[in-house]
């Protein structure tokens, strides 16, 4: 067998009769079909019709199968290899500058996160920009505990005039500052959690001057303030920070408090959106960068702050460890739970990791259709099976199975919709783009921290995807080299694999992606022949 699910094994043994559904115990009335797609299947020459349904906030798959002519795994399929593939590290395929892959290296045109943290610590302003698909705007941000009347005047002069203070929920409750509207009633586009506005009672007059607003901000940031110290409503707008910060919500509210805490200051920050001096509209990135240069301010992106925190924060906890006898052999299974979203992941460990040096590693993204049902559209299930076989043969290694990566991060339903678009002529990249979804939104920080917890320090990474090298770098892990996972090409997955090579930089065999021949020309078969030849010479 070449699949990892006992459910799948049972169904295959029983012949997987037509109209058999793999579903939780529920009635059909509790489910809503979202999408369906014809799915060629890698085993027993069958085709299936997959329906994607949603019920009780969970996604389910209904499989209806029937026998079809043997056309899925072609007799003339170009073999990309089996266990005979060379298992020595290959480093030339993913050549890259270390600085380019450094998680602390800022996005081009932005300052580094450590620089911004230091400026926040010193009571300076920082410009924080969010994603272009979100607001694509910038906020002036500084630590609330460091605000001065002069700083407030600068913020009001260059901002909208709506000055907010982001705060943790505990402090808002201590000061008895309820939300302006309930979460259910909040119709603001990004669901920003405004509380009732306030002015400090002491040291203010109208409450609107720069001096008055600075005093109000300082009072909000003080751990000694009490509910009776404020008038309601007022001219400062507290915002409720979501626990987990930018790892939970990629907003300015969360970014500002994260920066204050990273600077070792009280968890409260001033923020105000920056306007274009020319026409009063919201300033977008080019104008924000001009403003930063003119005022000698650091400018950072929330995306960079997310990467910074992912590298340093503890993202997972070990739940349990148990031995498992798998079809490949005996493994120790480690369950981990994400501290960000509660998702559970699993690592299969063979042998003794020991000092963590030179470990054969596969970080595998969940693919229900490929890993469980043997879809011929992709090579995911075959890669997983080959990785497990290689580790079993080596006697020492780790497979980290990351859930929540379905469809390169777009989810099961969207993946099936993308399949329908591929049937209409798009490739795997174009289908995601037509749906308005990212081509690949996966993050590998969870996987990296699991490997660290298991004791892995240096590894031979089994992958054809350079993004995994990038995603695992910077977590105290060293990638000694790449081990290609060369699996069979079929008529069903040929275009998919060619698209990954041409548009996503995947590397098959030992050559850099720019030099690999096309799949249609049998180039990967030639690569495999070269690997086999090299193995024989060794």
Swiss-Prot record:
Cofactor note: Binds 2 divalent metal cations per subunit. Magnesium or manganese.
InterPro entries referenced in this protein's UniProt entry, alphabetically: DHBP_synth_RibB-like_a/b_dom (IPR017945), DHBP_synthase_RibB (IPR000422), GTP_cyclohydro_II (IPR032677), RibA (IPR000926), RibA-like_sf (IPR036144), Riboflavin_synth_RibBA (IPR016299)
Positions contributing to Zn(2+) binding: 367, 378, 380
Binding site for GTP: 362-366, 383, 406-408, 428, 463, 468
Marked site positions, Essential for DHBP synthase activity: 235, 273
Pathway: Cofactor biosynthesis; riboflavin biosynthesis; 2-hydroxy-3-oxobutyl phosphate from D-ribulose 5-phosphate: step 1/1; Cofactor biosynthesis; riboflavin biosynthesis; 5-amino-6-(D-ribitylamino)uracil from GTP: step 1/4
The UniProt record lists the keyword Repeat: no
Residues where Mg(2+) 1 binds: 135
Reaction catalysed by this enzyme: D-ribulose 5-phosphate = (2S)-2-hydroxy-3-oxobutyl phosphate + formate + H(+); GTP + 4 H2O = 2,5-diamino-6-hydroxy-4-(5-phosphoribosylamino)-pyrimidine + formate + 2 phosphate + 3 H(+)
Location of region: DHBP synthase: 46-311
Binding residues annotated for Mg(2+) 2, in chain numbering: 135, 252
Protein name per the record: Probable bifunctional riboflavin biosynthesis protein RIBA 1, chloroplastic
GO cellular component terms listed in the entry, alphabetical order: chloroplast
Annotated EC: 4.1.99.12, 3.5.4.25
Binding site for D-ribulose 5-phosphate: 134-135, 139, 249-253, 273
Keywords from the named record: Chloroplast, GTP-binding, Hydrolase, Lyase, Magnesium, Manganese, Metal-binding, Multifunctional enzyme, Nucleotide-binding, Plastid, Riboflavin biosynthesis, Transit peptide, Zinc
Chain segment of the transit peptide: 1-73
């Amino acid at each position: 067998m070449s699949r990892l699910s006992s459910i799948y094994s049972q169904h295959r043994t029983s012949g997987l009769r037509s109209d058999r559904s793999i579903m939780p115990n529920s009635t059909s009335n509790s489910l809503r079909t979202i999408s369906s797609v014809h799915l060629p299947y890698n085993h027993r020459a069958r085709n299936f019709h997959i329906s994607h349904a949603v019920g009780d906030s969970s996604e389910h798959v209904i499989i209806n199968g029937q026998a079809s002519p043997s056309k899925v795994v072609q007799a003339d399929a170009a073999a990309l290899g089996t266990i005979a593939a060379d298992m020595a590290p290959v480093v030339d395929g993913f050549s890259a500058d270390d600085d380019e892959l450094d998680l602390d290296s800022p996005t081009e045109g932005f300052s580094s996160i450590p620089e911004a943290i230091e400026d926040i610590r010193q009571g300076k302003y920082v410009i924080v920009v969010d994603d272009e698909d979100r607001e694509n705007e910038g906020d002036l941000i500084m630590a609330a505990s460091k605000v001065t009347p002069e700083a407030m005047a600068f913020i009001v002069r260059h901002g909208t005039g709506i000055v907010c203070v982001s705060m943790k929920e505990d402090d808002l409750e201590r000061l008895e500052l309820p939300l302006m509207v309930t979460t259910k009633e909040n119709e603001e586009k990004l669901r920003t959690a405004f509380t009732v506005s306030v002015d400090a009672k002491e040291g203010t007059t109208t409450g609107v001057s720069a001096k008055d607003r600075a005093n109000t901000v300082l009072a909000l940031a003080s751990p000694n303030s009490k509910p009776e110290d404020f008038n309601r409503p007022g001219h400062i707008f507290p915002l409720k920070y979501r626990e987990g910060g930018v790892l939970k919500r990629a907003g300015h509210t969360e970014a500002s408090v994260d920066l204050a805490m990273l600077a070792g200051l009280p968890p409260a920050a001033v923020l105000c959106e920056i306007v274009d001096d020319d026409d009063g509209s919201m300033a977008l990135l080019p104008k924000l960068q001009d403003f930063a240069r003119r005022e000698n301010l650091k400018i950072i992106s929330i995306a960079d702050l997310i990467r910074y925190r992912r590298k340093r924060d503890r993202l997972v906890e070990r739940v349990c460890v148990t031995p498992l006898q798998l079809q490949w052999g005996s493994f120790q299974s480690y369950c981990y739970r994400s501290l960000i979203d509660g998702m559970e992941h699993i690592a299969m460990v063979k042998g003794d990791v020991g000092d963590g040096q030179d470990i054969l590693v596969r970080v595998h993204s969940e693919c229900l259709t490929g890993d469980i049902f043997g879809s011929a559209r992709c090579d995911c299930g075959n890669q997983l099976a080959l990785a497990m076989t290689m580790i079993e043969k080596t006697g020492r290694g780790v497979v980290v199975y990351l859930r929540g990566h379905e469809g390169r991060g777009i989810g099961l339903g969207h993946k099936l919709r993308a399949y329908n678009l591929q049937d209409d002529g798009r490739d795997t990249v174009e289908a995601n783009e037509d749906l308005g979804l990212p081509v690949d939104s996966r993050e590998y920080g969870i996987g990296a921290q699991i490997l660290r917890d298991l004791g892995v320090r240096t590894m031979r990474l089994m992958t054809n995807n350079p993004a995994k090298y990038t995603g695992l770098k910077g977590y105290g892990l060293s990638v000694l080299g790449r081990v290609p996972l060369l699996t069979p090409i079929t008529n069903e997955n040929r275009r998919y694999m060619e698209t990954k090579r041409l548009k996503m930089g995947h590397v098959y065999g030992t050559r850099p992606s720019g030099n690999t021949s096309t799949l249609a020309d049998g180039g990967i078969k030639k690569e495999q022949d070269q690997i086999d030849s090299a193995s024989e010479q060794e």
